[in-house]
From Swiss-Prot:
Keyword Lipid metabolism part of the UniProt annotation: no
Protein name per UniProt: Transcriptional repressor NrdR
GO BP of this protein: negative regulation of DNA-templated transcription
Annotated keywords: ATP-binding, DNA-binding, Metal-binding, Nucleotide-binding, Repressor, Transcription, Transcription regulation, Zinc, Zinc-finger
Amino acid sequence: MRCPWCGHLEDRVVDSREAGDGQATRRRRECLGCTRRFTTYERIEEILPHVVKKDGRREPFDRKKIVEGVARACQKRPVSAEEIEALVSGVERQLQELGEREIRTVAIGEAVMQRLRRLDEVAYVRFASVYRAFRDVGEFMTELEGLGRKEPGSKPGGEGSR
């Protein structure tokens, strides 16, 4: 593995452990060139469906886009990076279980919102406001009123009530 500090190609593994509910292996490495340490994550290569955008374009599934969108919605909320990663991993598993070659962005967005609503209601509303592109305050208010009708398993006040 190439060292991110000096570019040297040889290293040794100092520590290795399971990460992300067994979905990845976290390895702590030490460069044999500069002796600095860095962390890598190894995960199974998964075959994910192609994403069909609203305009009909198709592109490969990009986990990073979902992580970034959820992280933006969770800014200044009591939601950890690990919780965000777990949420996105759950969405990926759900998509894989469908067994489809292609999936529409709508289905991905709905899967994210379903999990985000259980994790943190404020982050859910933030994500929904961008994802659903409300045309007016009335649509936004309808969504907020829907939060009053709790889903089974949702936490009162989201995670903000810790």
